[in-house]
Amino acid sequence: MLSAAALLPALLLGLLWPGAVRGRPPPGRLPPGPRQRRWDAALFARSVARLPAERRDAARDGDYLLGYKRLRRLYCNVGIGFHIQVLPDGRIDGIHSENRYSLLEISPVERGVVSIFGVRSGLFVAMNSKGKLYGSTHVNDECKFKEILLPNNYNAYESRIYPGMYIALSKNGRTKKGNKVSPTMTVTHFLPRI
């Protein structure tokens, strides 16, 4: 429900917007057709939805958890090229060809932070304090990664709880310890593929 502080700007916007009030069009303009009226109504609705009071309410409700979940395969172009796979026994490694264990669900946890879920294995990608990747049955702080867009349009995934540790694959497809790599190394560069 809109608060009084949010209603005043909405009311003023509705009164001052020329397309919001039905009447004569301004001089030199044709009367708006049905398409133009729908467009004006859509723009008005969008502007009302972005009022500060509502934005605070939405952020409090934790609507980022309802964000856009992406089904992707994370491809690392190192060695012969590998996709990250999450196996049912909790191991995480790279495989050259796509398979059912390499399909991942990348979900936003908060702004710029994601969790990575192995769809077939039912495990989350997690990194421990030593930089080793493992599969976790439940989401915890070790399952949260900062998704960083690099200048070459690849992504790097940095541990949220252990800054400076990145998800990485070796040229043989094995995982590398997160504390032994940096985002300038190609072993940390991943391309999300559909």
Swiss-Prot record:
InterPro entries found in the cross-reference section: Fibroblast_GF_fam, IL1/FGF
Tagged with keyword Nucleotide-binding: no
Expressing tissues: Posterior ridge.
Residues making up the signal peptide according to the UniProt record: 1-23
Main location: secreted
Cellular location(s): Secreted
Keywords, sorted A to Z: Developmental protein, Differentiation, Growth factor, Mitogen, Secreted, Signal
GO biological process, one term: neurogenesis
Any one GO CC term of the record: cytoplasm
Alphabetized GO MF terms: fibroblast growth factor receptor binding; growth factor activity
Record-linked Pfam families: FGF (PF00167)
Induction: By retinoic acid.
Family listed: Belongs to the heparin-binding growth factors family.
Subunit structure: Reciprocal interactions may create a positive feedback loop between sonic hedgehog (SHH) and FGF4.
Function summary: Plays an important role in the regulation of embryonic development, cell proliferation, and cell differentiation. Required for normal limb development during embryogenesis.
This protein's name: Fibroblast growth factor 4
Native species: Gallus gallus (Chicken)
